Amino acid sequence: MPKVGMQPIRRQQLIEATLTAIDQVGMGDASIALIARLAGVSNGIISHYFKDKNGLIAATMRYLMNALIDNVHERRLALTDDSPRAHLQVIIEGNFDASQVNGPAMKTWLAFWATSMHHPSLHRLQRINDQRLYSNLCCQFRRVLPLPHARKAARGLAALIDGLWLRGALSGDAFDTAQAQRIAYEYMDFQLAKQVS
């Protein structure tokens, strides 16, 4: 009989083991057996909680996405300035938060992006994540720019955030958060300077 209250603990253990496994050997070689061994559980526990490896990968991605959402939300709650610039800054900061730019998270995101092109459920998660970023950026740009310009600025900043993140992930060096934020802020300020009086 399973212990009461163990499900959230086990699920988190398995998600953390998945991040570690992908960091160590990549998504393709991150087998159920390896993940279970890293988590200190039997292979059957993964099937019990997640059905299969794809279910575990989807849960791991939801975990990373929720960490991103939570980071942005916490930063927004701490804002004393309600300007579009301040809100855009916290979105940028959240996307370059340590929870998103550490080695295991970056390797998992990269593997997820590649895999999502071939798995409909993962592709759906990627589209949700992409749309959320675009929508949040557009909402803030829309406060000061006409809609067509706000959409274009949001698309550009989303692409820049993803591009900076991707370049950092592939560089092999520690992610330079300050530099990435500085570049994104410059683009943001350039777009905000176009505001209609």
Curated annotation (Swiss-Prot):
InterPro entries: BetI_C, DNA-bd_HTH_TetR-type_CS, Homeodomain-like_sf, HTH-type_TetR-like_transc_reg, HTH_TetR, Tet_transcr_reg_TetR-rel_C_sf, Tscrpt_rep_BetI. Residues 8-68 form the HTH tetR-type domain. Pathway: Amine and polyamine biosynthesis; betaine biosynthesis via choline pathway [regulation]. Keywords: DNA-binding, Repressor, Transcription, Transcription regulation. Residues 31-50 bind DNA. It holds the Pfam family TetR_N. GO terms for biological process: glycine betaine biosynthetic process from choline; negative regulation of DNA-templated transcription. GO terms for molecular function: DNA-binding transcription factor activity; transcription cis-regulatory region binding. PANTHER family: HTH-TYPE TRANSCRIPTIONAL REGULATOR BETI (PTHR30055:SF234), HTH-TYPE TRANSCRIPTIONAL REGULATOR RUTR (PTHR30055). Repressor involved in the biosynthesis of the osmoprotectant glycine betaine. It represses transcription of the choline transporter BetT and the genes of BetAB involved in the synthesis of glycine betaine. This is HTH-type transcriptional regulator BetI. It comes from Pseudomonas fluorescens (strain SBW25). The gene is betI.
